[in-house]
From Swiss-Prot:
<dbReference type="GO" id="GO:0043687">
    <property type="term" value="P:post-translational protein modification"/>
</dbReference>
<dbReference type="GO" id="GO:0036089">
    <property type="term" value="P:cleavage furrow formation"/>
</dbReference>
<protein>
    <recommendedName>
        <fullName>Aurora kinase B</fullName>
        <ecNumber>2.7.11.1</ecNumber>
    </recommendedName>
</protein>
<dbReference type="GO" id="GO:0044839">
    <property type="term" value="P:cell cycle G2/M phase transition"/>
</dbReference>
<dbReference type="GO" id="GO:0030496">
    <property type="term" value="C:midbody"/>
</dbReference>
<dbReference type="GO" id="GO:0032466">
    <property type="term" value="P:negative regulation of cytokinesis"/>
</dbReference>
<comment type="function">
    <text>Serine/threonine-protein kinase component of the chromosomal passenger complex (CPC), a complex that acts as a key regulator of mitosis. The CPC complex has essential functions at the centromere in ensuring correct chromosome alignment and segregation and is required for chromatin-induced microtubule stabilization and spindle assembly. Involved in the bipolar attachment of spindle microtubules to kinetochores and is a key regulator for the onset of cytokinesis during mitosis. Required for central/midzone spindle assembly and cleavage furrow formation.</text>
</comment>
<dbReference type="GO" id="GO:1990758">
    <property type="term" value="P:mitotic sister chromatid biorientation"/>
</dbReference>
<dbReference type="GO" id="GO:1905116">
    <property type="term" value="P:positive regulation of lateral attachment of mitotic spindle microtubules to kinetochore"/>
</dbReference>
<keyword id="KW-0067">ATP-binding</keyword>
<keyword id="KW-0158">Chromosome</keyword>
<dbReference type="GO" id="GO:0000779">
    <property type="term" value="C:condensed chromosome, centromeric region"/>
</dbReference>
<dbReference type="GO" id="GO:0005694">
    <property type="term" value="C:chromosome"/>
</dbReference>
<feature type="modified residue" description="Phosphoserine">
    <location>
        <position position="230"/>
    </location>
</feature>
<dbReference type="InterPro" id="IPR030616">
    <property type="entry name" value="Aur-like"/>
</dbReference>
<dbReference type="GO" id="GO:0005737">
    <property type="term" value="C:cytoplasm"/>
</dbReference>
<dbReference type="GO" id="GO:0007052">
    <property type="term" value="P:mitotic spindle organization"/>
</dbReference>
Length: 343
């Protein structure tokens, strides 16, 4: 069935793809109100009442497509009570916030247009919004909606109460087999979902992984992601220690880059540092390209087997995600707990 065009406004005057936040499928859980606070956030129109410089006002066609609802007033910052800061970045800050009417707790990411324009990453931000808004999985941080004013862009995100995986790893140094295997199962399941939707994350690392109330993993930060039907890319991106050989060598790459990344992550969680970490960038590059992989004697054989099967120079030889979650070491050690929304 052909998808109806849904053009939603963008503060830089360019048209988005034929998709939008307002086309998100709605799920009604048993024993819950017909419209949950999260759904109300997604249903809300993000069309703006005043034109952004260089842009004509456009009708948000998707606003009336959901549940037969009428057009709603767009969000403004006045709709939220702002709490403590959750994080700071190059382009803005993230705050704990509460939508006043529903009392629903969210993470509000506030980005400064001037910084985004200065760095020329408008397209990257729009791509992040378009991709993340259409991903609904218990191990992917949900983007509920967005709005903007003259100076800022606001992303309304799911709140992950237990914060960054990176900070927990810093505190503990390493994770045990149970926790690492659980993360591997959660990641493989979430990435299988992404890949089926032709989305490659390309920047899986501890800093981009958050933790929900029950400690469940939440993939965040889709800024480097691509939604490419061809699944063939040739741009350099991601984090140095996590870059796969094909990207360093400038070769075409596909979704197999995410398999390499989770192999590197598994090693770092078990050992405390990435497998190819070196004093210089050039040495790190050299070790990655040669797959100069060295395991400490303390590494469990099952984890070693899994990592070795993921960190292959030839992308086609890497262990498929289906086999990651079914790997004997993962099956024996994973303690995955699905959040209520997934039951």
């Amino acid at each position: 069935m052909a998808q109806k065009e849904n053009v939603y406004p963008w503060p830089y005057g360019s048209k988005t793809s034929q998709s939008g936040l307002n086309t998100l499928p709605q799920r009604v859980l048993r024993k819950e109100p017909a419209v949950t606070p999260a759904q109300a956030l997604m249903n809300r129109s993000n069309s703006q009442s005043t034109a952004v410089p260089g842009q004509k006002l456009t009708e948000n066609k998707g606003a009336t497509a959901l549940q037969g609802s009428q057009s709603r007033q767009p969000f403004t910052i006045d709709n939220f009570e702002i709490g403590r800061p959750l994080g700071k970045g190059k382009f803005g800050n993230v705050y704990l916030a509460r939508e006043k009417k529903s009392r629903f707790i969210v993470a509000l990411k506030i980005l400064f247009k001037s910084q985004i324009e200065k760095e020329g990453v408008e397209h990257q931000l729009r791509r992040e919004i378009e991709i993340q808004a259409h991903l609904k999985h218990p191990n992917i941080l949900q983007l509920y909606n967005y709005f903007y004013d003259q100076q800022r862009i606001y992303l309304i995100l799911e709140y992950a109460p237990r914060g960054e995986l990176y900070k927990e790893l810093q505190k503990s140094g390493t994770f045990d087999e149970q926790r690492t295997a659980t993360i591997m199962e959660e990641l493989s399941d979430a990435l299988m979902y992404c890949h089926k939707k032709k989305v490659i994350h390309r920047d899986i690392k501890p800093e981009n992984l958050l933790l929900g109330l029950q400690g469940e993993l939440k993939i965040a930060d889709f800024g480097w992601s691509v939604h490419a039907p061809s699944l063939r890319r040739k741009t350099m991106c991601g984090t140095l220690d996590y870059l796969p050989p094909e990207m360093i060598e400038g070769r075409m790459h596909n979704e197999m880059v995410d398999l390499w990344c989770i192999g590197v992550l598994c090693y770092e969680l078990m050992v405390g540092n990435p497998p190819f970490e070196s004093p210089s960038h050039s040495e790190t590059y050299r070790r990655i390209v040669k797959v100069d992989l060295k395991f400490p004697s303390s590494m469990p054989l099952g984890a070693k087997d899994l990592i070795s099967k993921l960190l292959k120079h030839n992308p086609s030889q890497r262990l498929p995600l289906e086999q990651v979650s079914a790997h004997p070491w993962v099956r024996a050690n994973s303690r995955r707990v699905l959040p209520p929304s997934a039951l």
